[in-house]
Amino acid sequence: MRKPTRSPKKDINLPLTTQGLFKVKFTGIQAKISFRCDTFLIDKIKNTLASQHLAGNYQYPNLSYFFRSALHAYQHGLPLTYQRELNNPRKEISFRLTEELMTFYNSLPLNSRTEIMERALGSFYYQYL
C-alpha cells in the first residue's frame, strides 16, 4: 500500500488593499496582542464581513485584517468618533500585528490601549463598511 504524501505548501502573496487612502499590504506579521473588546461590535463587524464576502467583496478577507486596517487608519489620522458602550459584554480577542503597527501600539498610553483600539475599530467600521 502506498503512503500518502503531502504536497508542499504554496506561498501566495496576493496584494490586499483597503478602501480609500489606506492601501496597505500587511507583510511580515510578527507580534500578537490581546484585548477585551465589545462582543456586540465584534458581531456587527463579523456579520458585515460575512455579507460582503457573500456579495463577492473580499476587501477585508478576515477579522484580523480588519483590525490591522483600523489600527493603521488610526495611526494615519482616523478621528475616533465611536463611543464605547461600557455596559456591553466583553470578549478576549487576539490578533497579530506587523512590526510597524506593534511599535505604534506600544507607543499608546498603557491604560488607554483597549479604549483606543475599540474606538478605532468602531470608527473604522462606521466610516468604511
Language model feature labels by segment:
Residues 91-93:
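C-terminal extensions
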Residues 1-89, 98-129:
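A detector of short terminal or domain-flanking linear segments
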